Design a protein with these regions (language model features):
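Active-site anion-handling motifs in enzyme catalytic cores
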Residues: 369-745
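Nucleotide-sugar donor phosphate/pyrophosphate-binding loop at the beta->alpha transition
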Residues: 62-66, 101-103, 111-134, 147, ...
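Aromatic "clamp/platform" in nucleotide-sugar-dependent glycosyltransferases that forms part
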Residues: 256, 275
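Short His-centered aromatic/hydrophobic patch
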Residues: 82-88, 106, 653
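A conserved mid-protein helix/loop that constitutes part of the nucleotide-sugar donor-binding site
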Residues: 13-24, 193, 197-219, 233-240, ...
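Short hydrophobic beta-strand element within catalytic cores of glycosyltransferases
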Residues: 35-36, 292-295, 305, 649-651, ...
């Protein structure tokens, strides 16, 4: 593989570090050449690192383009990789004339690159904005940068994420801590706790908030000191602010620091106060030194720092919150050690330079593989379901379906019908169309190979006749427009109205190629409706394949809710439904019973926040025992992880039962819909009661029975393991309809 990199050559900061370290390491594996458009320290340093570097400094763009075309034609390159405005402009011109795929790395928000320079913003900024749209692929230097690009309409299928890699090999400071602090002018003895920041002193870095927060924290912790490494236009203002707040003697401005190893080794706390970031090197530098970190919650920072688990986050500009975090760390050396060690471990695993190099090579291989992919008039899959409504169960279904499609064909274009297309694009990195944007999704259907009617209970008329008619319409349209049609891990029924049953039977019989079902009741329902033509396969709910988040992440979530990670809990998931109001008191009293009898703290966990939180509060209003309502359970892996920490789960929601069953938690189901009893029967569990027949005695009796099952691994895991085995039939059926090889175990 041979790649040519195009960059202006005037870059500094994180972009410079990223490009030079990446190219130095890539050149050990593949052929890499770099072209700069100006001579200077960047090009000189690249040569010193052994990177093949050539400078085309001619200001005549057309002449430079001719030279580049000749170099690329004669050099036998496979791919063009651009960086920055000038590189992107050249890449956009070279794309068609060379026939090579062109990718760019977006190092920063291109709309902010020329703030304060109106002429450059109008010229270079406009050119860069246009050029970015003309390139084939884009790489964001953090997940947050990719999110930003998606929000601005860039195709998620043509975006990649890479992080600024760091060499985590052991580093040795040039001098000891006390000597270094004296050398930069900070008076501090061994009892002092040193907080620090390395940043340009400009408005975006918002060091003023750090000084304000430090001054408040210093009043409570006089042993605190602040070391600021960096320079910029705000230096004098910041010095004046420190004096005004009475901490000039405890704040040291060290200027630009070249010996970053010794700087970070001299700190006790690393900080970042930026108003905007992609993914700052300052955090991984601090992580390399195992420093506990306090950072503003911006850009890609939350992808590295899990609040309360391996660091502390605060809202940008909030000096009071920052001060509280500084005080907490200054007063607790053990907490500093634990947070620093956890951050170091995560950074080594995910952000080491070796990982960055491997990721870049993977991206090149993906791009070249896609270039070889046959281009047909039809490609990809369109997925339709109850998505984009904030229901954790439906979101988990989509996550599982997308994961299984990517496993079958990592380059398969995936489109999703969603009530919130923007949220779906950001969350799942897929293209999305508004669910009821009929012209748009019909246009897409004419170009896809597979239409998936997603998992869940879409074929029912209990909640709505119109939703059933809509889903049947999309199935018919997809088949008429030339798609293979798959109903994926779904439930069927109840469909009560005779005309609806007749319509559903006709459409499924005529327009569906295969149906994979999540339970035996759905199989019986299809038989009763006379649906026989499609291939019908008994499988399982797709979400049984999803894992829980790492234990330390769930520990942090529980701690942030004021809950002991090692506590004993009973989970309740409730939803509004006809008849629930009359039974709400029973749930509250049963929760009290679990607390009084077994010492289980009731925790209410919603699946669909906009509906379930109110139902949980309604039941909790009848309680006397201590309890907690988690109003937002987060992403699917977080939600599953929270259910895994329950000793028993009582639920009206199907996916609370599915998530809990997958983690071996004893279950009590309250049946408002046949899907609850169907699932529990399917996995061999018998503790469930119809909502209308629920009594206090029956509910507490089933809680007693569930408590007795705690620790019965064979019973609790047996049915779910069988589900995970048969769930493979979902993706096997999809592979068959797409003409792909079946998935590997």
């Amino acid at each position: 593989m041979k790649v040519i990199h195009l960059i202006s050559g005037g870059d500094s900061g994180g972009a410079k570090t990223h490009v030079l370290s990446l190219l130095q390491n890539l050149s050990r594996t593949i052929e890499v050449d770099m072209v700069c458009f100006m001579e200077g320290p960047f090009a000189q340093e690249a040569r010193e690192l052994g990177i093949s570097t050539q400078v085309y400094s001619d200001r005549n763009v057309l002449r430079t383009l001719r030279l580049l075309k000749q170099k690329i034609r004669e050099g036998g390159y496979d791919l063009i990789h651009c960086h920055g405005a000038r590189g992107n402009m050249m890449g956009a011109f070279l794309r068609k004339s060379t026939g090579l795929p062109v990718v760019t790395t977006v190092h920063s928000d291109y709309r902010l690159d020329y703030l304060g320079r109106p002429f450059s913003r109008v010229t270079y900024g406009t050119i860069n904005t246009l050029a970015l749209r003309r390139l084939d692929y884009r790489i964001g230097v953090s997940d947050a940068m990719v999110d930003l690009l998606i929000s601005r309409g860039f195709d998620p299928d043509r975006l990649f994420t890479i992080y600024n890699g760091l060499d985590f090999s052991p580093r040795h400071p040039a001098m000891d801590r006390q000597a270094y602090l004296r050398s930069v002018g900070l008076e501090a003895d061994d009892s002092c706790v040193i907080a620090g920041i390395a940043a340009r002193l400009n408005p975006v870095k918002d060091v003023a908030t750090l000084i304000r927060g430090f001054a408040k924290a210093h009043a409570a912790c006089p042993q605190l000191r602040l070391l600021i490494a960096g320079d910029g236009e705000q230096l004098d203002m910041l010095k004046g602010l420190a004096a005004e707040l009475g901490v000039a003697g405890q704040v040291c401005f060290a200027g630009w620091v070249t010996d970053t190893n010794t700087f970070y080794q001299s700190l006790d706390i690393n900080t970042l106060t930026s108003l905007s970031e992609t993914f700052p090197y300052a955090l991984t530098e601090g992580a390399r030194a195992s420093l506990p970190t306090i950072s503003s919650r911006v850009g890609g920072v939350p992808y590295l720092i899990d609040h309360g688990v391996n660091g502390l986050l605060f809202s940008p500009g909030d000096a009071d919150e920052l001060a509280r975090h500084l005080v907490a760390l200054a007063q607790d050396a053990t907490l500093r050690h634990h947070l620093g060690q956890r951050l170091h471990q995560k950074a080594v695993e995910e952000y080491a330079l070796e990982s960055t190099v491997r990721r870049q090579l993977d991206i090149y291989e993906i791009i070249l593989r896609r270039q070889q992919r046959p281009h047909h008039s039809r490609d990809g899959a369109l997925v339709c379901g109850a998505y984009g409504r904030g229901n954790a169960g439906d979101d988990a279904i989509l996550e599982a379906i997308v994961a299984e499609l990517r496993h079958l064909d990592p380059d398969l274009p995936v489109w999703v019908l969603s009530r919130s297309p923007q949220d779906t694009r950001l969350k799942y990195r897929v293209n999305s169309i508004y669910t009821f944007g009929v012209p748009k999704f019909l246009w897409r259907m004419a170009r896809t190979r597979l239409y998936i009617n997603g998992g869940g209970s879409l074929m029912q008329d209990v909640t709505s006749h119109r939703s059933l008619w809509f889903y049947l319409f999309t199935i018919s349209a997809a088949k008429r427009l030339g798609n293979q049609v798959l109903m994926y891990g779904c439930g069927i029924g109840p469909i009560h109205h005779p005309s609806n049953r007749k319509r559903a039977s006709r459409v499924l019989q005529k327009s569906v190629d295969a149906i994979t079902l999540r339970d035996t009741h759905s199989l019986s329902e299809l038989e009763d409706m006379g649906v026989t033509r499609p291939e019908i396969v008994l499988s399982a709910d797709p979400t049984v394949i999803l894992p829980a988040a790492e234990p330390e992440v769930i520990d942090g979530m529980l701690e942030s809710q004021g809950l002991d990670p090692h506590g004993r809990y009973i989970g309740f998931t409730l939803r509004p439904w006809p008849g629930f109001e009359e039974k709400a008191e029973l749930f509250g009293r049963a929760a009290d019973y679990a607390w009084e009898t077994y010492g289980l703290t009731p925790v209410f966990l919603p699946i669909e926040k906009r509906l379930d939180v109110a139902a949980c509060k309604r039941a909790a209003a009848y309680m006397k025992a201590p309890h907690h309502i988690v109003e937002d359970t987060g992403a699917s892996d977080h939600t599953i992880g929270l259910f895994a920490r329950m000793q028993v789960v009582v639920s009206m929601r199907l996916h609370a039962l599915v998530f809990s069953a997958g983690q071996g938690v004893p279950l009590v189901g309250v049946v408002y819909d046949q899907k609850i009893s169907s699932f529990l029967s399917y996995i061999g569990q018998d503790l469930f009661t119809d909502l209308g027949e629920l009594t206090y005695e029956r509910l507490t009796g089933q809680i007693d029975a569930a408590v007795r099952r705690i620790g019965d691994v064979q019973f609790l895991s047996g049915g779910v393991e069988r589900l995970r085995q048969v769930e493979r039939r979902n993706s096997e059926t999809a592979a068959k309809l797409l003409g792909l090889a079946p998935p590997k175990p």
